[in-house]
């Protein structure tokens, strides 16, 4: 049986590739970034991916925002990842796109709409 090894970021050929990066940017409280350390600590990874010709796709969240009365998941400006997006855009001089989520009451969670994701993925693949 062949031994498979996972390449490090420095070893990987990222030219023209889309790289999914799970980041812990869960630092927004009441619509503001309390401490940017977690965001800042990902700059080297994001920049390395770009330097190697890759296109990073960041995946994060901001807590589990629930309405205190109903217990339902809510999507409000104060629990949005937009403060993180604006911070990254400013610090790294990037343009970042964030897909919109749609509430699915029957399931009690948010899902990505195909109508939203298909154009974003198309742009990502074409390098826009």
Each model region followed by its residue ranges:
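Active-site loop-to-helix "anion-binding N-cap" substructures in soluble metabolic enzymes
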Residues: 1-128
């Amino acid at each position: 049986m062949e031994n498979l090894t996972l390449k490090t970021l420095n070893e990987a050929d990222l030219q023209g590739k889309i790289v999914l990066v799970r980041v812990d940017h869960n630092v927004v409280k009441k619509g503001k970034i309390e401490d940017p350390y977690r965001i800042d600590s990902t700059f080297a990874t994001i920049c390395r991916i770009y330097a190697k010709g890759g296109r990073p796709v960041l995946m994060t969240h901001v807590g589990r925002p629930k309405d205190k009365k109903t217990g339902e998941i809510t999507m409000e400006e104060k629990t949005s990842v937009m403060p993180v997006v604006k911070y990254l855009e400013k610090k790294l001089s990037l343009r970042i796109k964030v897909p919109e989520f749609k509430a699915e009451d029957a399931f009690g969670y948010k899902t990505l709409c195909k109508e939203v994701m298909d154009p974003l993925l198309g742009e990502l693949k074409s390098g826009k």
